[in-house]
């Protein structure tokens, strides 16, 4: 069965928006996350939710640049950019940018000639590997976000149960 470009774009959409068998999508795991929680580092040495969103944004940008003919690589700063401004507005904007780039990537995949899937695309990796790798990458990081949210929740419970804490003064 030949692989249809619409099928690949659909997998990119499902990993980001939902309606898949695997569990929650990127958008689903980000729902309800505040800017404060997104910027938090509840696990020592791990990236924050916000940093992961910026990392995913960089990944989408990279593949889009390659689709448009660049032989692009990400610098370490582009791969894991720092959070520039920690505000609710900046958090909303970064999520919006991620969503827009996901939609652009889906459109680019739909328009991509299927006969070129096995050819290198701006790197040593084929278009097929990069297009199919995008939802894999999204879901890997969606799982990390789920764990970060659990760690945030556990740290709140731990703080609330800390001896000597008097919540009556709040």
Language-model features and meaning:
Residues 2-23, 27-30, 35-81, 120-170:
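Short, contiguous alpha-helical
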Residues 83-119, 129-137:
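Acidic/histidine-rich alpha-helical segments that form the ligand environment
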């Amino acid at each position: 069965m030949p692989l249809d470009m619409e099928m690949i774009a659909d997998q990119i959409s499902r990993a980001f928006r939902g309606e898949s068998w695997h569990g929650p999508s990127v958008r689903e795991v980000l729902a309800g996350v505040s800017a404060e929680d997104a910027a938090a580092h509840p696990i020592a040495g791990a990236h924050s939710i916000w940093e992961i969103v910026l990392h995913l944004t960089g990944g989408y940008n990279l593949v889009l640049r390659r689709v448009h003919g660049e032989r692009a690589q990400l610098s370490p700063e582009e791969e894991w950019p720092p959070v520039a401004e920690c505000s609710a507005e900046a958090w909303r904007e970064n999520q919006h940018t991620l969503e827009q780039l996901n939609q652009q990537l889906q459109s680019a995949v739909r328009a991509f000639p299927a006969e070129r899937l096995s050819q290198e695309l701006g790197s040593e990796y084929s278009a097929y590997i990069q297009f199919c790798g995008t939802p894999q990458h999204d879901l890997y990081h969606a799982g990390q976000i789920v764990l970060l949210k659990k760690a945030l929740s556990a740290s709140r419970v731990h703080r609330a149960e800390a001896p000597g804490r008097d919540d009556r003064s709040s």
